[in-house]
């Protein structure tokens, strides 16, 4: 037989941000500006199986320093130094209590189950935790720009340099909780696996 079930799981989204700016006139021909922005947020979004959710944490910050120097009435020099950092963590969250015996990996949350199809993305139905649990990334950008603007009548010439260093660290191995695939509902009820994937040892990049 079949049974219809209706769920209204709670979606939790939270975000905070702030920004600060300061300007200072060093002298008539020089102006200094500094700015900083920070943003933090997290969300818990239930999956198709309402007993499990995806947990996402985001963070970003940007700091910049600018110095504008008036060389002459027709020449302007602008120097900028900046730093930005972005980070995210993507994980699995359980919205109910499960015994340890239901986990594919010892000490971890329950993994994913797919019925029909060769993978979770093509399955008829899915259950269990997020297959991308434990994914994270950190990226730093260091930027330096130095530019000159020359104005002559209705004409303007701009030239300068732009340098940037990128630092990127990540760990994006999926299926750490394990994913079990069954061909049909009958094979699922019989406990006959078609495929099982798990990443026991993952490594960071960067």
Please report, for each region that a protein language model flagged, where it lies by residue.
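Short acidic-glycine motifs
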Residues: 1-206
């Amino acid at each position: 037989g079949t049974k219809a079930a209706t769920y209204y799981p709670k979606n939790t989204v939270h975000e905070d941000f702030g920004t600060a700016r300061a300007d200072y006139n060093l002298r008539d021909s020089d102006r200094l500006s500094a700015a900083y922005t920070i943003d933090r947020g997290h969300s818990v979004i239930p999956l198709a199986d309402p007993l499990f959710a995806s947990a996402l944490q985001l963070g970003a910050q940007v700091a910049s320093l600018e110095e504008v120097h008036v060389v002459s009435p027709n020449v302007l020099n602008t120097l900028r130094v900046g730093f930005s950092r972005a980070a995210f963590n993507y994980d699995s969250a359980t919205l109910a209590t499960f015994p340890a015996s239901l986990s594919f990996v010892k000490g971890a949350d329950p993994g994913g189950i797919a019925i029909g199809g060769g993978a979770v993305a093509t399955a008829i139905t899915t259950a269990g935790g997020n297959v991308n649990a434990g994914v994270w990334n950190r990226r730093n950008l260091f930027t330096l720009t130095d530019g000159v603007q020359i104005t002559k009548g209705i004409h303007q010439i701009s030239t300068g340099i732009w340098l940037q260093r990128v630092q990127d660290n990540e760990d994006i191995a999926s299926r750490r909780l394990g994913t079990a695939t069954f061909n049909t509902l009958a094979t699922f009820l019989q406990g006959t696996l078609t495929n099982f994937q798990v990443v026991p040892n993952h490594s960071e990049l960067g």
